[in-house]
Amino acid sequence: MNIIFDMDGVLVDSEPVIEAAAIAGLKEYGVEAEPEDFTPFIGAGEDRYIGGVAEKYGVAYKKEMKDRVYDIYLEIVSDKLKVFKGTKEVLNQLTDDGYNLALASSADAVKIEANLKVADISQFLFKAIVSGEDVEEKKPAPEIYLKTADKMGEAPATCLVVE
């Protein structure tokens, strides 16, 4: 059996962390964002998450904005990231029971790596890790799941997705 996990909202709660980093980062570009501004863009990948809010306030999105948000994210993630209770134990038990695990997240690789490190979840538990940077179409499009199954060397029909 093959299980593909999402990261945010499944293994960890990083939304408050990226939100705080985005508010602080966008402020440096003259955007006075509010937490609720980000709600429509949750799960759409960081380019859209940050860019959508910047554009709402009439500021053109630039890649440097995301870079700055990630700088801030990396500074605060160890204090703010919430790991859901039992996450590590469940992942370790599934691995011990012979399940192939993978991670498919719309987040960028830098965020995935930071979250796994802070959560003390070994990347080696996962047969494949696919980020939003690895696909053209974001969720709910199936591309990320198909790519993850392919990277695992498994047929998509043999994979269970936990979102």
Enumerate the language-model features and the residues they cover.
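Conserved SAM-binding loop
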Residues: 11, 83, 101-104, 137, ...
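Substrate-recognition element of Asp-dependent hydrolases with the DxDx(T/V) motif
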Residues: 22, 90-117
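Structural signature of beta-strand start/N-cap positions in the alpha/beta core
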Residues: 1-2, 100, 158
